Amino acid sequence: MSSAWKTPRGSDAMPEIMVKIIGSKHFQYLVEKPKIKENDSLKTETQTMHQKPMTDNARQMSRDTPVPINFTDQQTTDNPDDVKEKKHPENNQKSENNQKLLTGANSSRFLDGNIPSQANVHCSSVPTGDQSLSYVHGIPRRKLRDWSLEQMVRGSSDQPEDIGQSPSGTTNEDAFLLALVRRELKSRPLSSNLLEKLQKELKILDPISSGFLLQSQLSRLFLKHEVPLQLPTVKILCQRFSKRGSPEMVNYEKLLWFLNSAASDYPQQNKAAADLRKTESHGTHSQSTPPQHSSSQPEVNRSLLEILKMALRTTNGRLNIDNLNLSFRKEDRSFSGCLPLPKVRAICGKHGLYLTLSLLETLLNHQDLGYQNEIKWQNFVEMLTRASSDLLSDLPTGKNEKKAPAPPMEPEVPEMSQSKTEHMKTPEEELQPESSPAETSACKDPLKPLKIRPVSQPFVNPAVKNKAEECETWIDRFRKLENALYLCDLSNTGVLEKERARRLIHNYNLIYNLSLSPQKIDQALRRFRSGENMLLEPALRYLKEL
């Protein structure tokens, strides 16, 4: 192409704008082509088109300041045709003058002929005939962080006060988030009753006490209780307290704690507590609970003993604490003295002691029992022995006489278990204290000693208490159903497949004669389902209360 554009000595040369597209960008430069007589009419038209804006803008450029950066000067150095232009200094000088005029014409397309700051312009070369500013591209910036939260908080009047008081332990995001939540709670503050309702329903939605729920569940719950927070704020809160591995899971305990601190009237105490929460998240989860109970530790111990007494009353004296201790010792393979909550619950369930999730949380929050989301089983066994001894001392005199042979038989159990294996001796040890009182109290009926679990017979003498006996036996049979369902949950997740749970409940309903109607079973399955699974604890509680 350059050989065809050589200018003869006697011919006039006219500058022409050439445009190249390199990498989705337009680059223009000026070249001088010979003026051919055949195309005079075409060239005059193009010359008038280019020279009109040149002459108009030349006057404007004389008054305005020169353009700071000439983009065409940078591009002409890489053009191979410019090497030949350097041989003709007159033509080269003309092209430079025309080039300056063209850049001035292009600059007039911006506001009042001034090019905006060059940091915001990525390509300012002009394609031919383009009157829109589509050739101006913004420089691609690095996406640092989401400043929407900061801008929303800056719109409030009290934002500088909140940030000014933020201690060094809290980050700017936490300070902004705290200020944003407080600003939205000004018109309608959160009440303690609403927070308690939220906490109860969150625990129902989380039957295994994992501490995490889906963002959709939290959003629906907040809409249900009309929490005075906007949906973008709720989304930001969920992102702030989300799990590292799975961002859809939210730590609802920390979120509720944050809302409670934001709703209170003492910001300095809240931020000091936030610092404690920061340090707690790096360490253990249960280290912040002992100071809460340290002031009233004897009262907490007494209330915990009362709760354990209530749990022991449901066993009807069948719990052998020594066997329970041996099972805990066998399960503790690391000899740490601590076991997780699912294992503690499963072992206690095998021995006839059924612990609810609320009771397990109480044990975990106790100063002497909880450690790093695990339970110190040795201290738990000691507290169980204290509760059982207090329960025996609280019984009336008539029942003490009947239950008197039971305590001396307990120390015989470990002596027998030392000589034989633990697994073979556990059912025999449970049957020995049951058969001896059955023989003494009911010798008239020869078939009574052959029954598997005649637990309620030695304690019920009058015929008036037949209804109470039937209720106790129904509860025992229902506990067999509970134990079977929990044993099917091998991973201790607290949920079971809905169809499998339906089949098991119907089968055990017929086997143990529980008299549960199929409509009630279907209603429990529909009400307490999570996707294709069923939540075990609330469904069983619902069936038990029928």
From Swiss-Prot:
Gene designation per UniProt: C1orf87
Name this protein carries in UniProt: Uncharacterized protein C1orf87
InterPro entries per UniProt: DUF5580, DUF5580_C, DUF5580_M, DUF5580_N, EF-hand-dom_pair
Biased composition (Basic and acidic residues): 81-93, 274-283
Domain of life: Eukaryota
Species assigned in the record: Homo sapiens
Pfam families cross-referenced by the UniProt entry: DUF5580, DUF5580_C, DUF5580_M
Ranges where the record places region Disordered: 37-101, 269-300, 392-443
UniProt feature, compositional bias: Low complexity: 284-298
